[in-house]
Amino acid sequence: MKPVFKEQELVDVMEVIETTDLMDLVVFNDDVNTFDHVIQTLIRVCKHTNEQAEQCTLIIHYKGKCTVKNGTFDFLRPFRDAICEVGIDAKIV
């Protein structure tokens, strides 16, 4: 016997599952860390390309913050911890 589901119900359930698990790793601007330090940290920790790291760093500088990675909390925690260990302010939101 086949379960009876409407296609829209399945899509709605899948959207809820996908959106509730995803979180953002956000890096915040400060007056202490240099551009080079933030860029090198994003390359080393988040595996960004040089261009990605530079763009994120400029956004952090001009906008005050930038999302540098997405994923579940458990996935993002080691990235956040490594970024914070080198003195850069990062939070999972």
Could you say what each language-model-derived stretch is?
Residues 1-93:
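Terminal domain-initiation and capping elements
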